[in-house]
Amino acid sequence: MIKNSFISVIPQEDKKRKRGGSVEFQVFNFTNKIRILTSHLELHRKDYSSQRGLRKILGKRQRLLAYLSKKNRVRYKELIGQLDIREPKTR
């Protein structure tokens, strides 16, 4: 996986400003961590501490996506499309 792959997700004009705290950037980072941990767990099925870490990151990403969906539905839909994430089921 490419370390600087977020360049294609975040628009080029926004690179000048520091975007590390934006919701989109945080969700992108969590998604990368989730993909890395998922591939790790395919090889090491009994690594329970990594499973716990994956569940924690999934929860954090879910909360951030819920926040973004309430605040700005357009940015939420755009982010989900770019990262190729399923929209969570509503209860």
From Swiss-Prot:
Molecular function via GO: structural constituent of ribosome
GO BP annotations listed: translation
Keyword Transmembrane helix in record: no
Keyword Chloroplast: yes
SMART domains documented for this protein: Ribosomal_S15
Pfam families: Ribosomal_S15
Gene Ontology cellular-component terms listed: chloroplast; ribonucleoprotein complex; ribosome
Disulfide-linked positions: none
Main location: plastid
NCBIfam families cross-referenced by the UniProt entry: S15_bact
Subunit structure of this chain's protein: Part of the 30S ribosomal subunit.
HAMAP family referenced in this protein's UniProt entry, alphabetically: Ribosomal_uS15_B (MF_01343_B)
Family, as annotated: Belongs to the universal ribosomal protein uS15 family.
Protein name, UniProt field: Small ribosomal subunit protein uS15c
Species assigned in the record: Ceratophyllum demersum
Lineage: Eukaryota, Viridiplantae, Streptophyta, Embryophyta, Tracheophyta
The gene coding this protein: rps15
